[in-house]
Amino acid sequence: MRILKTIILSVFLGIGLAAFADPVLRINFITPSIVRVQWSNDGSLQENNTGACVYTNQSVKVEKTENGDEIIFQSSELTIKYSKTNNGIIFEDKDKNIILNQIPNSLKAEPSVQEKIIYDEKSAHVEETANGKVTVKDIIRRDTIGRSTRYYVSFSSLNEKALYGLGSHMEDYLNLVGKTLYLTQHNLKAMLPMLCSTNGYGLLFDAGCAMKFKNDGSITTMQLEGAKTLDYYFIKGARLDDVVAGYRYLTGEVSLMPRYLFGYTQSKERYVSSDDIINTLKEYRRRHVPIDMIVQDWNYWPEGWGYMKMNPKYYPSPKALADSVHSLNAKLMVSIWPNPQWCPEAEDFKNRGMMLEHDVYDVFNPEARKHYWSYAKNEFYSQGFDAWWCDSSEPLDGDWNRIPSHSLKDENKPYGWDDQEYRWQLNKDVLSEALGVERSSLYSLYHSMGIYENQRAEAGNTKRVVNLTRSTYAGQQRYGTVVWNGDTHASWKSFRQQIPSGLNYMATGNPYWTVDVGSFFTRGDGRRWFYKGEFPEGVKDENYREYYVRMFQWGTFLPMLRSHGSDTPREIWRFGEPGTQYYDAILKMINLRYEHIPYLYSLAAMQSKGSYTMARLLAFNFPEDDNVLDMKDEYMFGDFLVCPVTQPIKESATRKVYLPKGAQWIDYWTGKTEEGGKWIECKSEISTLPLYVKAGSIIPTTEVAEYAAAQIGKPVTINIYPGADCDFTIYEDEGDNYNYEKGAFASIPLNWNDKKNTLIIGQRQGSFDGMLNTRTFIVKTPKGEKKITYKGQKTTIKF
């Protein structure tokens, strides 16, 4: 083994910095509780330049000592011990308790090559896929066109019970201890290399390549497929919220979504004309069913593929369409794609040298991002469209299309077999070929950056950026994105897998995640690994109606409630009429969602102004309860304990629910209080799902309205769920602009004293245009309710 020569560069301006030459390692205190570790085998420490991190180094007081083989760095929160002989690093808390070990001699590097696939042009043909029309060719050979370095590093943490994060994946994992996860961008994978532990730390790996995570129960190994430098951040955090706070310090704050996003969004594949969209909205309004946004999916273009131009035959005036939607008090989202083909837009990008391999625009070029925005602006933004659906932001896949027959193990599986490692290899190869191995996972981050920065740069912009997208990376939370989990198939098994997928994604510090309620594919063909829907009759099948309702109940308690999919329509009247069980169950959930918009919007502000996460795996709140560490089908949504029903009633008319210990729980539907730390059996009636509120919670609600803006000025009910002292802050602003960044918002603190049965409504802080100076609050407890007029001054209400 090679012993590294130790060179102490400096401990200056309070920043601890140590480096070692050939290979070279650097340890850098970013804050007293965040440490950056970089290692390279070639004597240099080049930046990976992912664009993920935007922090400013704090001036950290660090003491350096040496003890034989060890070099020791100590801040007010951490002690770092580095071994000169074996590259081991020990991370300790301020009381000298070991949090994490970078295992000695685990740093490894080996050559990594970037290949260009050479295709047989004579075999080229166009196929329809779930991602649109694609040109498919047979592979002749692979040529090496670039080189990088593959890195390995391993860690151990004593008695580690749970690991979470790494993005949204469909392997049916929550707790990642003992698991292997293949990380790349994909239709059904949103990779984000942030790992969180209940042992009080997080790790952010800052490299733009594909990765592999493996934990054997005691040792975690990360494999980075191609990077200039192994670069990771150690984040100390006593609880998961503290780890999230560290992640957001490094990568940026969460954008505050507009208020309307917390209403209901209706989508499907697809509305075929302006009239189709307008008539659908009119039907919602006729039925008085709340809705805030409707979505135009793909194939609105007149020619080619992905052309940001509406076909005048079916969409004669984009502005008239947007105006009509707005006249119905709704917002309009449109699907845009990064891969224009066979159209003037594609030729324009090619002529400007702004296209990468596989006909995706060069998102890493700022001028190309600006040019892409010019198309989106001219056809949509300038015409009044409100929100973006940046589809296919991976932006390529290698396992969604037909695979050449000579590479198949099974000729009956023309799209390959459902093997995670095999599919990871296919996808990382095609992404590396087009984007480069060192940035194969970064496309969505830069695509989102382009939409966000260019919209915000528009003169007179009054709309918050909303970007529904399918891929992600660290730092994307600052660009107004909501990630959804891709083109899922409708089966109860798939439903169950989706819940932990979202919880792990949101545990990374990126809180906005959603699904296609009802799942994308309802049909299946038995041949394609992804096309496995089990309800070919769609809404005609009562079994699918039940499935849809159960997913809708779950989606009600996600940051964005959105119905979408292929094969069958999704509007509420497709599931029955008023008075029938499925229609009424859907309407009940929509109404419940709208009642709670004051609560949801306040939670959103907590996310944007701090470390909070709205939808939370149970270890956020109850890390000491071992029963919840791998609880895949329950989670917290604010102070709600949400327990989706994930099997048909014919299999079971009840649903077992675990109530975490450390709290009492109040049944939302009945008001009955239960002690925590036990399992109970709940009825799984189609009209509801098991839903509990933590005793000691304040939940503000308001009257149901047909759209979120119509609720402004309505009385707000302050619901007290007693059992413990608690507080909450109601947040309000103008709802859909960035004036809140300049201080244009108001907050109203609420404090409940449980022993005294007293609520204190504190003095309102701040103001904004349109703020209600006088308003009605209804304070509701199990002992009764009181109606008060609030004028911004401290008010005490005793029961």
What residue spans do the PLM features occupy?
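Extended Gly/Ser/Thr-rich low-complexity repeat segments
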Residues: 31, 45-56, 81-95, 104, ...
